[in-house]
């Protein structure tokens, strides 16, 4: 390819498709080690300047072979349950492990406390049920709060402050719980909120005002305040200065240690999904290229969110001479990646490169329809690639029955 694309999702490639990518099997994920390191350095610099602590939210990126690139700059990992907590403890040893779950299982708590340093509960009932044992085990105990402050538009599925949300405790819920159990506040070491999704720091400032209004009287008695995730800190144009002011405000006003747990920011624009064209069909006015990669299986957020992932050297439909619809090979009628403006309709066998594919892909993919899991490769700063892991029939089969 002689095309160039210097948009952020493809900047790690230098704006071109390196020849060595043509040699990789498709579909495959390619993680860019240099981009991961740069993201981690930005987050580490924030921590150094402000004294906050930054955690990797493993729900977005959990390719632990790359953890050594991140660990020098981060305080640890954030987990959503037992398995992620164990992964963080094993693969980022010596670092903090924080865990939050909407509801914990009683039969997992004994093992969970072996790995976790901070355990955050979602409700007063779970705090009362498991908090005493967590405290007795020497863990720092927190409660996720719901400041009832929505700052998102159009993505209710990702809004923890949406009406009727199951995530976090409102002030009214907390007051009722304390009235019934006055000893409940004695279990708390910190508060946690997570209300953002791919947002700038102005949304955090708005949320922090709501936290101060609803829960400000509790915070001086806390050791820490966790700002959660959804902060697009490593995105070009992100207002880091405002974020630093928010952190300093919390530290000075309430005397707390501030934690942040970004997921996307750790691996933003640090990965690619490589795919090849299997067939090109024409249905009326619609040109459709069927790929060996599936939206449903290999980039499920495309359907779930939904969104259209960036494609190298492509534009909006109608902005280039041709418009093509890219779709997966599964039997799902809706296995469609999106419509793109391109210079020419791709040919069978052509390599296509999707950007920003390190996040919410390898940790969410699946084998629906018997689709193979893509291999995972890593690309060093020198441009050399190495295989991390590949998958085969056994990985599909043994999720479904006995070995």
What spans do the regions from the language model cover?
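A short small-residue
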Residues: 18-24, 190-194, 228-229
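Glycine-rich beta-strand-to-loop/alpha-helix junction loops that act as flexible
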Residues: 194-196, 225-234, 262-265
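Extended, folded domain segments that form the structural surfaces/walls around functional sites
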Residues: 200-220, 232-258
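Charged (often Lys/Glu-rich) extended helix/loop segments that serve as interaction or gating elements
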Residues: 246, 257-403
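Active-site-proximal beta-alpha core segment in soluble small-molecule metabolic enzymes
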Residues: 52-224
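Feature marks short, surface-exposed loop/turn motifs that line or immediately flank catalytic pockets
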Residues: 149-151, 197, 233, 266, ...
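N-terminal capping/small domains of soluble enzymes
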Residues: 5, 9-94, 100-104, 108, ...
């Amino acid at each position: 390819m002689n095309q160039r694309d210097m948009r952020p999702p493809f900047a790690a490639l230098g704006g071109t498709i390196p020849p060595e990518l043509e040699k990789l099997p498709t579909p495959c994920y390619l993680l860019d080690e240099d981009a991961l390191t740069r993201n981690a350095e930005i987050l580490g610099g924030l921590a150094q300047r402000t004294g906050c602590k930054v955690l990797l939210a493993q729900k977005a990126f959990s390719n632990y072979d790359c953890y050594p690139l991140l660990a020098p700059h981060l305080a640890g990992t954030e987990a959503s349950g037992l398995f992620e907590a164990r992964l963080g403890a094993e693969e980022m040893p010596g670092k903090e492990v924080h865990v939050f779950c909407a509801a914990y299982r009683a039969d997992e708590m004994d093992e969970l406390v072996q790995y976790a340093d901070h355990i955050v509960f979602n409700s007063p009932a779970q705090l009362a049920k498991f908090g005493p044992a967590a405290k007795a085990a020497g863990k720092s105990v927190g409660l996720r709060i719901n400041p009832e402050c929505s700052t998102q538009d159009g993505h209710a599925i990702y809004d923890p402050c949406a009406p009727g949300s199951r995530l976090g405790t409102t002030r009214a819920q907390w007051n009722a719980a304390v009235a019934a159990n006055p000893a409940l506040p004695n279990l708390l070491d910190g508060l946690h909120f997570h209300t953002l999704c791919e947002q700038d720091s102005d949304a955090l400032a708005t949320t922090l005002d709501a936290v101060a209004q609803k829960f400000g009287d509790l915070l001086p008695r806390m050791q820490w305040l966790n700002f959660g995730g959804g902060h697009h800190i490593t995105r070009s144009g992100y207002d880091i200065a405002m974020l630093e002011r928010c952190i300093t405000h919390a530290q000075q006003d309430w005397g707390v240690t501030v934690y942040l747990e970004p997921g996307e920011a750790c691996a933003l624009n640090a990965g690619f999904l490589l795919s090849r064209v299997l067939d090109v069909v024409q249905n009326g006015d619609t040109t459709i290229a069927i790929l060996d990669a599936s939206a449903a299986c290999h980039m499920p957020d495309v359907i779930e969110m939904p969104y259209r992932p960036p494609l190298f050297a492509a534009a909006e439909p109608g902005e280039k001479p041709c418009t093509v619809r890219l779709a997966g090979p599964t039997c799902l009628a809706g296995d469609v990646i999106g419509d793109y403006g391109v210079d020419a309709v791709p040919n069978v066998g052509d390599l296509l490169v999707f950007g920003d594919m390190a996040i919410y892909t390898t940790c969410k993919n699946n084998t629906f329809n018997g689709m193979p899991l893509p291999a995972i490769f890593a690309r060093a700063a020198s441009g050399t690639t190495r295989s991390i892991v590949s998958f085969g029939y056994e990985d599909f089969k043994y999720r479904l029955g006995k070995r």
